[in-house]
């Protein structure tokens, strides 16, 4: 047998196998192919590249052929927008616009939607921005506008607080003008913390740490909004050294009348009810109803659950305990402030500011509107996403226009208790406790004989 003849010969009863001494070592990187039609040693076959789409009727890839084109996968939006969400948002925005053109009771009803419209639209844009870049940038632009509006509000209140005529048209001198401009500048500078997350997410070199830790655009926007507005609401108190609304009331006896206008006590109570309706409508949209959640999921996200008899009894007991804690807390805070000689909240000015609510009907309305509205907005929307501490700081800052630091300290501690109640139970229970707490405080403030 020729030692160089490596072919396999057919015999009548099978294949004849060469002797081991006659078999040459195959070259490296080659595979053996036993066939009568092909050489015995071939290069390894070329594996076809992975395809991003099924090949379908594409012929098999042969050596020397160019690979088929690679198609990018189609992007499918998972956040589908429900028509009900569109109807609710358009209705809210339409009411806000029409409120500029209508007066009377109907106009007051429409004007009550302004606050809810701003924050609801911001939240909806944040949800849409999860998969739509235009909505993400629109949400950050809208946040910039909201903080700018808050800065001008602070400027106006500060102007009323330092004006020499009590109406804000004139100021006494350069010092007062400098104070007002400082309030405006520092309030607008509160926008910087809100934009820092957006800058980190820009194409200028981000590490996507927020996404890795679960910090989606929605949570970043909620964080920026809460921090910026918390600082902005406190800015007049920090710079002026006193709450701007109380300072304006002390300078002008007409200020309280100007705030109520021609609405009267009954009109103010109706305005609170109007605002509550719009807040509840905005809340269900702000947590993604019609985008990420259905009705049941929305109520669960807000913590609004059916109250049982047992939970109702627990809420009443917690209300009584919170009232007792409030009395001890106010006593301790007042003595601490007096010991250090710090300025406290003017009780007479507070009573004059809220005198329109010092009736049994006013106590009921405030208990319902403040309890339900604030709990849904703060403990229902913000707390599950940002936690108790940060959401409670925002809740406390909302009262900085009329309360001094001693009263804000009391509000902060009360808010912490309500936040713990919300965490251990639900928003329904915390709303009952909050409403009952405010109801009793208003009843206790009603002058004797009324």
In which residue ranges do the predicted regions lie?
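Alpha-helical transmembrane segments of polytopic membrane proteins
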Residues: 107-121, 171-190, 267-280
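Juxtamembrane helix-loop-helix connectors linking adjacent transmembrane helices
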Residues: 172-174, 206-278, 287-369
